[in-house]
Amino acid sequence: MAKQGKNKVSKPRKPPTLKQKLKKESKVVKAKDLQWKLVDIPDNLGDYEGFYGLEEIDGVDVQIVNGKAEFIVRDNGKVENKSKKEETNENGENNMDVEDNETPEVEDEKPTEQEEEEEEEEEEEEEEEEEEEEEEFAGFEDDENNQEDANTSERVSNNDKDDKLAESNDELNAVSFANLDLPLPDDNEINLPNWQEGDLGSSISAYTLYGLSQLDFKKPTPIQKETIPIALSGKDVIGKATTGSGKTLAYGIPILEKYIQSLNLIKQNNKDKKINHPTGIIFAPTRELAHQVVDHLNKLAKYSPLSTRGIVSITGGLSIQKQQRLLRHGPGIIVATPGRMLELVQGDSELAKRLASIDIIVLDEADRLLQDGHFDEFEKILELFGKNRPKSKSIEWKWQTLVFSATFSRDLFRKLDRHQKGKSSSLMGNDEIVQLLNEKLKFKDKKPTLVDANPKEIVSGQITEALVECGPTERDLYLYYFLLMYKGSTLVFANSIDSVKRLVPLLNNLNIPAFSIHSSMIQKQRLRALEKFKEASQKNEVAVLVASDVAARGLDIPNIDHVVHYHLPRSADVYIHRSGRTARAGKEGVSVMFCSPQEASGPLRKLRRLVAGNSNKESRLNMHNDVKLLPIEMDLVSQIKPRVEISSKLADASISSTATRKEDSWVKQAAEDLGLDDLSGLEDFEDDIIKKQRKRKEGKMLSKDETKALKYELKTLLANPIKKNTRKSYITSGLQNLAHQMVTGAHHDDVLGHEKVNALSDLKGSKNKNKKIEKKRISKKK
């Protein structure tokens, strides 16, 4: 029995857990023994708010024991010994055996049986305690062999991961050279005679031409034809063209060609296989425009050596950490808004040095970027790039600058409702434009090349402008009339966010799919609203996007048939860019203004003088004789008026109830934070204006029964069709033969007895349809 007691069978020794490993590998050190590092403060941060000599440390845990802080670090002594052994093995020193036999002797000594039993008992006790605390980890410790295999496989996989990460970092720094040896497209697949002629064809690579052919861009626009050869020669360019004229490709193609040239140089010089800086940075005034530019350039660069990671957008409203990772990957082209780019560059001096080596800087919609208040951030970015730009033979002393916009005029930015002293001109001379931009941008060339593709146009000649005269309270009525009569996708602009929020439920109540986009929405909400609008415009005959001026600049929303100015814009440049959302890529479109009598006498007259007059004021410039009045059929307006009134009441009630609910919840939350229970006397401290606003909102609110009754009444009205001529007793009587229209499919879907109408054809001044019908009818009788 005694022998059996001595020779007791011990449990198989379990591998140490993660907690045990960390406990063995960690040690407590004093604060002064830690390896502190000085914080590198960028030069552009000045005195860093008075903080000097800051130090930091990584990989240290802090534990509070009996009120004192203990600093815990991993013991890296074993790692250092291994590195020393590797060095001695490589050098082949004679005393290698002595060193090897000295240090491991203590570790390799076999412990006695008693020590082994004591260690095993201690480890078993620790493991039992840990199993009670962390039951979820018990399943990994069932089989010793499996655990050892898992540990070895983990080591191998970790080593493989490290190798793969190192390889991927090399690839990312070189902007993914997997496509460097991409074969050139076959010339037979490229059939673009208009792109391949003259200086333009000799300067564009086969990759870009193939991309243009796949996108079905068969002919360059005037601004593209004139600016691309100049930009490819390395000169600074100022491009002026109307909205929708293809300015994105006018600067996108030169940047892409410059990138391809850099790759060819790398292919020739095998010594240097890294592109440490982006080829170009494109600055856009709005986030939506920046994302749109990235989308357009990705479609073109899809068939070129530029990888999918090669073009990135850096804008506000999205994760800054993700954008920092994207910039570490070394993109070839960056599209950014000035605010977010300045934030990233100021906080990272290495990034500022890398980006300062760029070849091309582009200002898209430059008139907005150079306005007072908008240029400060961009000016700081240029200053940082100038300070950090390296002096090297391979990098030019100054980057190339490309500037594009539809408008260059101080007068266009002035408020239309303000009195202007003296007579103002709508356009600036070419010398004035160059001088103004040179003062702010400091071009590389002494005199940059200015290309004016449309010297006699501000609003595109493809846009037909129209006017609807209405009272201030009748805008909803005439907006519904326009959307009801003229099918298609419509973009409605309002001057205030409150108006945008009110119009969407008003139109939805009238069975018109409407979506909103404004500056109070976060970036993801804006992009989601744009996607929903695009889907609705493809599915339905009518789709409406109600927007503030955040959507006025640069956005290329496909197939916009009409632009409606629910409010007259505050300045002429806003009107130009709003109207430019339609009639893009050579198509035609309609721009309609709703104007009250008060606006017609002042702001409208100033707007027409700025937009339609040239600098000499001798003739019209926008190729339109005057703004045409939209034809309105008052008998139809009177029939739809009850619908709009009910829908307006429902929309106002929903908005008022939502606003009141938010205010009440905010007041209650503030009272809870302050520890107040009784809020009965709070109204005595409210301002008179706030009281009036609250009473106005409460007056618009409806009860549940009232809301149900109004919705039922509106549903009944929408079910009854509108009639062209209510006095007709038979469908074949009158000037319009309803039976014939229904058979031929020419009848209006929402108005009985009315033909299908098109806003563009109605405004172009075709012959009177009623007169034609009367003549045909008279000739038939004869």
UniProtKB/Swiss-Prot annotation:
SMART domains: DEXDc (SM00487), HELICc (SM00490). Residues 96-147 have a biased composition (Acidic residues). ATP binds at A241, T242, T243, G244, S245, G246, K247, T248. It is found in: Nucleus, Nucleolus. A motif (DEAD box) lies at residues 364-367. Residues 478-635 form the Helicase C-terminal domain. GO terms for molecular function: ATP binding; ATP hydrolysis activity; RNA binding; RNA helicase activity. One of its GO terms (biological process) is rRNA processing. It catalyses: ATP + H2O = ADP + phosphate + H(+). GO terms for cellular component: nucleolus. InterPro entries: DEAD/DEAH_box_helicase_dom (IPR011545), Helicase_ATP-bd (IPR014001), Helicase_C-like (IPR001650), P-loop_NTPase (IPR027417), RNA-helicase_DEAD-box_CS (IPR000629). It is an enzyme of class 3 (hydrolase). A motif (Q motif) lies at residues 197-225. Coiled coil: none annotated. Residues 1-22, 766-782 have a biased composition (Basic residues). Residues 71-88 have a biased composition (Basic and acidic residues). Keywords: ATP-binding, Helicase, Hydrolase, Nucleotide-binding, Nucleus, Ribosome biogenesis, RNA-binding, rRNA processing. Residues 1-24, 71-164, 762-782 are annotated as: Disordered. Residues 228-426 form the Helicase ATP-binding domain. The Q motif is unique to and characteristic of the DEAD box family of RNA helicases and controls ATP binding and hydrolysis. Belongs to the DEAD box helicase family. DDX24/MAK5 subfamily. ATP-binding RNA helicase involved in the biogenesis of 60S ribosomal subunits and is required for the normal formation of 25S and 5.8S rRNAs. This is ATP-dependent RNA helicase MAK5. It comes from Candida albicans (strain SC5314 / ATCC MYA-2876) (Yeast).
